[in-house]
Amino acid sequence: MYGIEYTTVLTFLISVILLNYVLKSLTRIMDFIIYRFLLIIVILSPLLDAQNYGINLPITGSMDTPYTNSTREEVFLTSTLCLYYPTEAATEINDNSWKDTLSQLFLTKGWPTGSIYFKDYTDIASFSVDPQLYCDYNLVLMKYDATLQLDMSELADLLLNEWLCNPMDITLYYYQQTDEANKWISMGSSCTIKVCPLNTQTLGIGCLTTDTNTFEEVATAEKLVITDVVDGVNHKLKVTTDTCTIRNCKKLGPRENVAVIQVGGSDVLDITADPTTAPQTERMMRVNWKKWWQVFYTIVDYVNQIVQAMSKRSRSLNSAAFYYRV
């Protein structure tokens, strides 16, 4: 009996000794692996190009302000500025390096040369068909033309506001505008719009629904049309659909990353009289025009004051986003 107890105690002691040996061996192996791994990291760290993911950014303050990355020299937080101008400006200046000159001048106002983009357009009508405003801040220069006041006003209304639009099937349905913010916007190479208001029996008011020649014509061969009719009244429409598309749109509010600058003209365009414009102020301004160099110098000089009246938080705009924005 005593022999069995001694054997049991001896077996237990041997097991404890073996377990202790195994644990010490594992500890030495793990220490070797960890120290070797740390040694490799220490050796390779000077050779690695680390990236700081905003550790040194302040908690408060404007995120539009450029901060320098602690491990890189370039500016990684910056705003982009697009300047849209008519092609006649470049023709008059007639200098292949004029954009580089302006970029250097913008640099004196705190705008890096890589953040300024120059985009030309042929005329107001063609620009209105396919506006592309992709920068954080967009300045649109429109030279005043007394014969194009309506086109300039409609383009400004389109650019300075956000719109929610849906397609219209004018061959199958009647349409009505629900309130002042509800407009029909047409774009294309040639848009002719005719309307026929209907009474509660769907009979034409002053027109025949079966004869489009009796419809009232509200636009003729235009590239951009913002149609406003009597609210709450159904209308049958006739549109040159082969050269024009029409959408049922709702004005949502200001597009704050766009400013329209009228170049020259004794009359200043004003779209704030529209009751759907709220607040009754818009990012529209006028600069005197003698030569285009003078215009661009003025823009550079006042660019920061102009941008202060804007916000880069608005959505970008092109013709597709304008039609299908959700």
From Swiss-Prot:
Give me the ranges of the annotated region CNP motif.
165-167
Which compartments is it annotated to reside in? Answer: Virion; Host endoplasmic reticulum lumen
MF annotations from Gene Ontology: metal ion binding
**What is the protein's major site of localization?**
virion
Top-level division of the source organism's lineage: Viruses
- Would you tell me the Gene Ontology cellular component terms? host cell endoplasmic reticulum lumen; T=13 icosahedral viral capsid; viral outer capsid
Keyword Metal-binding assigned:
yes
Name the Pfam families for this protein: VP7
Query: How is it modified post-translationally?
Result: N-glycosylated. The N-terminus is blocked possibly by pyroglutamic acid.
Query: Which residues bear sugar attachments?
Result: N69
Chain sites annotated for binding Ca(2+) 2: Q177, D228, V229, D231, D301
Q: Which UniProt keywords apply?
A: Calcium, Capsid protein, Disulfide bond, Glycoprotein, Host endoplasmic reticulum, Host-virus interaction, Metal-binding, Outer capsid protein, Signal, T=13 icosahedral capsid protein, Virion
The signal peptide here is 1-50
* Disulfide-linked positions: C82-C135, C165-C249, C191-C244, C196-C207
User: Is Transmembrane one of the keywords?
Assistant: no
Binding positions (Ca(2+) 1): D95, G206, T214, E216
For this protein, the record's InterPro entries field holds:
VP7 (IPR001963), VP7_1 (IPR042207), VP7_2 (IPR042210)
The region called GPR motif is annotated at: 253-255
Q: How does it assemble?
A: Homotrimer; disulfide-linked. 2 Ca(2+) ions bound at each subunit interface in the trimer hold the trimer together. Interacts with the intermediate capsid protein VP6. Interacts with the outer capsid protein VP5*.
Family per similarity comment: Belongs to the rotavirus VP7 family.
Q: Remarks, anything else?
A: Some rotavirus strains are neuraminidase-sensitive and require sialic acid to attach to the cell surface. Some rotavirus strains are integrin-dependent. Some rotavirus strains depend on ganglioside for their entry into the host cell. Hsp70 also seems to be involved in the entry of some strains.
Its function?
Calcium-binding protein that interacts with rotavirus cell receptors once the initial attachment by VP4 has been achieved. Rotavirus attachment and entry into the host cell probably involves multiple sequential contacts between the outer capsid proteins VP4 and VP7, and the cell receptors. Following entry into the host cell, low intracellular or intravesicular Ca(2+) concentration probably causes the calcium-stabilized VP7 trimers to dissociate from the virion. This step is probably necessary for the membrane-disrupting entry step and the release of VP4, which is locked onto the virion by VP7.
Cite the HAMAP family for this sequence.
Rota_VP7, Rota_VP7_A
The name under which this protein is listed is Outer capsid glycoprotein VP7
Tell me which species this is from: Rotavirus A (strain RVA/Human/United States/M/1976/G3P[X]) (RV-A)
